[in-house]
């Protein structure tokens, strides 16, 4: 049975999750998008700011933007741990035990910062 968990409500988007999927809503298009979670995947954080948001799971990060629509995933390595998630109007920064990655509102993927 599907159970709804937390949600993040922002002026331009909504990010929410259940035990089976993550939901993203683009206010500008009036459009919902979903991505399925894996059988052992759980959402630990939902963070957003401005036009961009991210769902953090035990297996990956899922970036969502009001501009590009859809979810853009980044898989974690086996021993990688999320240390911090910070955001600005057009980007989310995720710091892990092994790298820093950025998802920008106008992009269709994650960028690793060295």
What is the role of each PLM region?
Residues 1, 30-36, 70-76, 110-114:
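A short beta-strand motif characteristic of beta-propeller blades
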Residues 1-12, 37-51, 78-91:
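Repeated scaffold domains used in trafficking and secretory/extracellular systems
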Residues 7-17, 23-24, 48-56, 62-63, ...:
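Short beta-strand elements that form the blades of beta-propeller/WD-repeat-like
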Residues 27-28, 66-67, 105-107:
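Inter-blade boundary loops/turns of WD-repeat beta-propellers
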Residues 36-38, 58, 75-78, 85-86, ...:
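Short, surface-exposed linear patches
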Residues 53-58, 66, 72, 80-81:
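Short, solvent-exposed interaction modules
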Residues 100-113:
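Short, low-complexity, Pro/Ser/Thr/Gly-rich segments in the mature regions of secreted, periplasmic
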């Amino acid at each position: 049975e599907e159970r709804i968990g937390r949600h993040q409500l922002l002026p331009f988007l909504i990010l929410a999750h259940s035990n089976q999927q993550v939901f993203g809503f683009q206010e500008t298009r009036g459009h919902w998008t979903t991505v399925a979670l894996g059988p052992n995947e759980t959402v630990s954080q939902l963070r957003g700011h401005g036009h961009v948001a991210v769902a953090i799971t035990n297996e990956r990060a899922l970036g969502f933007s009001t501009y590009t629509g859809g979810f853009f995933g980044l898989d974690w390595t086996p021993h990688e741990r999320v240390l911090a998630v910070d955001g600005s109007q057009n980007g989310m920064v995720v710091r892990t035990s092994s790298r820093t990655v950025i998802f920008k509102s106008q992009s269709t993927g994650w960028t690793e910062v060295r």
